[in-house]
Amino acid sequence: MSNKVHLGHTARKRFGQNFLTDENVINRIVGAISPDNDHVMVEIGPGLAALTEPVASGIDKLIVVELDKDLVERLKEHPVLKDKLEIHQGDALKFDFNQLVREDKQMKVFGNLPYNISTPLMFHLFEFAQHIENMHFMLQKEVVLRLSASPGTKAYGRLTVMAQYHCQVMPVLEVPPGCFTPPPKVDSAVVRLVPYKVKPWPCKDVDLLRNLTTTAFNMRRKTLRNNLKQLLSDEDFAVLGIDATLRPEQISVEQYVAMANHVFDRK
């Protein structure tokens, strides 16, 4: 049998499918997720239910968002899960997670995310951060390193700034390729993202912050003065106390927020 086939389902490259099969890793991830009935439990991309089954076993209801119609049909017929699942067939990148919000419950979101959409999906989820208690995702190890990076490192970039603006970022464990069917060509890791209830550095316009960081990191080797000349003058940098000759990866999240707020106040 092909190593792309697991439990009778062939992994689809266009959906970025790699199915988690290592029981020890699965148990450690479920322990980190800590399923309970006090939160709205949401899984993105349940696949062949490697995480779905153990998470659902200890709770009353689990909401899943799955794009693959064949996998949705399998879940609907699952002998154990079918009565516990609320299934939404569709693209998580376009899904309105506000429809899952309950007045008295925050969401816990988790999933083994397709690596080809993981970054845009996290940006999408940040829009619902005020309704989320925490998120646990299996990602490409490189992405977890970017999420948790410190200023002055190669991994530090736009994703780092936006993730750390919205959330505390904590790597949980590393997962080698052999834990999946088929094995991905890269190492994986699990990360915990905990949205801030109160932002340490409140931004007056998050869209402006996103655009400013995108512009700053478009040319990583050039200085802030060069990259942000359409937004900030030398006088602005002096007022902010930021050295305009620094490169974008040398600037902290707090400083990016200060720059965005300065541009906003000048409007």
Curated annotation (Swiss-Prot):
Known catalytic reactions: adenosine(1518)/adenosine(1519) in 16S rRNA + 4 S-adenosyl-L-methionine = N(6)-dimethyladenosine(1518)/N(6)-dimethyladenosine(1519) in 16S rRNA + 4 S-adenosyl-L-homocysteine + 4 H(+)
Enzyme Commission number(s): 2.1.1.182
Primary localization class, coarse: cytoplasm
A cellular component term, taken from the record's GO annotations: cytosol
GO molecular function: 16S rRNA (adenine(1518)-N(6)/adenine(1519)-N(6))-dimethyltransferase activity; RNA binding
Keywords linked to the UniProt accession: Cytoplasm, Methyltransferase, RNA-binding, rRNA processing, S-adenosyl-L-methionine, Transferase
Keyword Amino-acid biosynthesis set for record: no
InterPro entries listed in its UniProt record: KsgA/Erm, rRNA_Ade_diMease-like_C, rRNA_Ade_Mease_Trfase_CS, rRNA_Ade_methylase_Trfase_N, rRNA_adenine_dimethylase, SAM-dependent_MTases_sf
SUPFAM superfamilies: S-adenosyl-L-methionine-dependent methyltransferases
Pfam families, A to Z: RrnaAD (PF00398)
Domain of life of the source: Bacteria
Described purpose of this protein according to its UniProt entry: Specifically dimethylates two adjacent adenosines (A1518 and A1519) in the loop of a conserved hairpin near the 3'-end of 16S rRNA in the 30S particle. May play a critical role in biogenesis of 30S subunits.
HAMAP family assigned to the protein according to its UniProt record, in alphabetical order: 16SrRNA_methyltr_A
Family of this protein: Belongs to the class I-like SAM-binding methyltransferase superfamily. rRNA adenine N(6)-methyltransferase family. RsmA subfamily.
Protein name: Ribosomal RNA small subunit methyltransferase A
Species of the source: Shewanella pealeana (strain ATCC 700345 / ANG-SQ1)
Gene giving rise to this polypeptide: rsmA
